[in-house]
């Protein structure tokens, strides 16, 4: 049982250190020998619960943990309240619709209603999404304290995945202002060429973002249709907000 307890403690510590920890750093926080820590991490890595950065050699939580967490969240009030609205929205706009949350500094998908191309990037439940280059990630940052948002951006490896990806702090800061002003975020071929993503916030009883409702779409150049989809997205996000208040 001691090994299990230590493994769970290791996962808990890593969940608070999203940039990862070395064997020595984790051993210090767990107050156990580095050799024991290494054995625990080797076991967790073998089960895909942690991953090791090839360059820094630091360990962080693996995506499998996020999938497990998503399974727990499925039964939550939020997901249950959103399910019907998500299905209706997906049918009306004929696009994939996803529900995202932010927990412990990580943004992830927790529910999805699929229409059209189900193989589209970042649609899988439990998938951790970047803040800087996704519509939902930017929505979360736009509605949090700006200092906190900038700290998140500074920690992220902001890679240009397409020529259109915004990576500069100044341009991303301006984008967050725009999102607050219009109430939604649009990613136009920034994550994948030919793909657009749109998200807007779902608010809890305190007026704080509880989640983000988003859809992805192949870019078709029809701006009028896109605006119709955005209006529907905002309407259904408000419907879900009302349901959880």
Question: Can you say where each PLM-predicted feature lies in the sequence?
Answer:
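Extended hydrophobic
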Residues: 164-239
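Acidic, low-complexity proline/glycine/alanine-rich linker and hinge segments
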Residues: 158-164
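N-terminal helix-turn-helix
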Residues: 1-74, 79-80, 238, 242-243
């Amino acid at each position: 049982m001691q090994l299990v307890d230590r493994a769970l403690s290791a996962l808990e510590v890593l969940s608070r250190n999203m940039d990862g920890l070395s064997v020595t750093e984790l051993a210090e926080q767990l107050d156990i020998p580095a050799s024991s820590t290494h054995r625990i991490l080797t076991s967790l890595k073998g089960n895909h619960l942690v991953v090791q950065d090839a360059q820094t050699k630091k360990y962080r939580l693996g995506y499998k943990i996020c999938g497990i967490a998503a399974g727990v969240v499925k039964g939550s009030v939020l997901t249950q309240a959103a399910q019907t609205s998500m299905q209706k929205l997906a049918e009306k706009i004929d696009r994939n619709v996803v529900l995202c949350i932010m927990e412990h500094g990580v943004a992830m998908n927790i529910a999805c209603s699929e229409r059209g191309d189900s193989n589209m990037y970042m649609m899988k439940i439990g998938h951790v999404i970047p803040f800087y280059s996704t519509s939902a990630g930017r929505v979360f940052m736009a509605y949090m304290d700006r200092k906190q948002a900038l700290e998140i951006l500074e920690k992220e490896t902001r890679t240009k995945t397409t020529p259109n990806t915004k990576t500069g702090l100044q341009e991303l800061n301006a984008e967050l202002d725009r999102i607050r002003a219009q109430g939604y975020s649009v990613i136009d071929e920034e994550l994948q060429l030919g793909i657009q993503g749109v998200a807007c916030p779902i608010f809890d009883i305190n007026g704080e973002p509880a989640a983000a409702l988003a859809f992805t779409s192949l870019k078709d150049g029809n701006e009028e249709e896109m605006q119709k989809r955005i209006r529907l997205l905002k309407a259904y996000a408000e419907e879900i907000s009302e349901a959880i208040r």
